[in-house]
């Protein structure tokens, strides 16, 4: 039990010692910066082709399947 607590304590303290800001390493920080880490499926909102999953393209404001390659 003491080993587990020590390990967790090291995980909490280590980022502050290395100088890395916690918001740069967490999903909540990604949400604050607007980074999503996931892609949009068919019919979901997009701004660029890279926002869409797989072979979907951003057609207007939603991801759609197209027979021609994305731009």
Curated annotation (Swiss-Prot):
Q: Which cysteines are joined by disulfide bonds?
A: 39-53, 46-58, 52-63, 57-70
TM annotation in the entry: none
**GO cellular component assignments:** extracellular region
Q: Where located?
A: Secreted
Q: Which GO terms describe its molecular function?
A: toxin activity
Major place of residence: secreted
Q: Which InterPro entries match?
A: Conotoxin-I_CS
| Family classification | Belongs to the I1 superfamily.
Q: What is this protein called?
A: Conotoxin Tx11.3
Q: What organism does this protein naturally occur in? A: Conus textile (Cloth-of-gold cone)
């Amino acid at each position: 039990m003491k080993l587990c607590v020590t390990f967790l304590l090291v995980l909490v303290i280590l980022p502050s010692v290395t100088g890395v800001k916690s918001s740069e390493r967490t999903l909540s920080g990604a949400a604050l910066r607007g980074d999503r880490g996931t892609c949009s499926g068919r019919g979901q909102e997009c701004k660029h082709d890279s926002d869409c999953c797989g072979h979907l393209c951003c057609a207007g404001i939603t991801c759609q399947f197209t027979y021609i390659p994305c731009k």
